[in-house]
């Protein structure tokens, strides 16, 4: 295994994957948020998701032996999602996702999933970058691990 010089962490939806055709928001007393019922009703359409411009950087990082690539998504991954990852997106070195019934916040999910990497010797000197379209998640993860963040503007960052 090559020496790990870089750690690239990618959110999926709105960052490298365009799943907007099955995404919508609702507004309630707490503000605007993703309509999870609609999202779940349309999860079978994952193979119709598209790729966003940041995907080119993701593919470049996947081909770089000195870069360890992680996807950290708040999605519950089902068969169509995994098919999309395997056949279209390309599999990262590690994958963090929500399990069915998990209701913790996306930022907590991502922080807990990433914590072990920042304690491993292999990653101590790696230059880490987190690509995310949700400002709250981006700030929480970058502040927790003292890493660089790249905000990706999207309409899916709720």
Regions found by a protein language model. Give the residues of each.
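Short, flexible coil/linker elements and helix-boundary hinge sites characteristic
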Residues: 30-31, 50, 119-122, 146
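General structural signal for secondary-structure boundaries
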Residues: 49, 55-56, 105-106, 113, ...
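Acidic, Mg2+-coordinating phosphoryl-transfer loop and its flanking beta/alpha structural elements
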Residues: 125-158
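Substrate-recognition "cap/lid" segment bordering the active-site pocket of phosphatases
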Residues: 77-128, 137, 143
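Surface-exposed amphipathic alpha-helices with a cationic face
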Residues: 59-63, 118, 142
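Generic marker of "main functional regions" within proteins
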Residues: 22, 26-27, 95, 124, ...
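Alpha-helical substrate-recognition element adjacent to the catalytic core
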Residues: 2-104
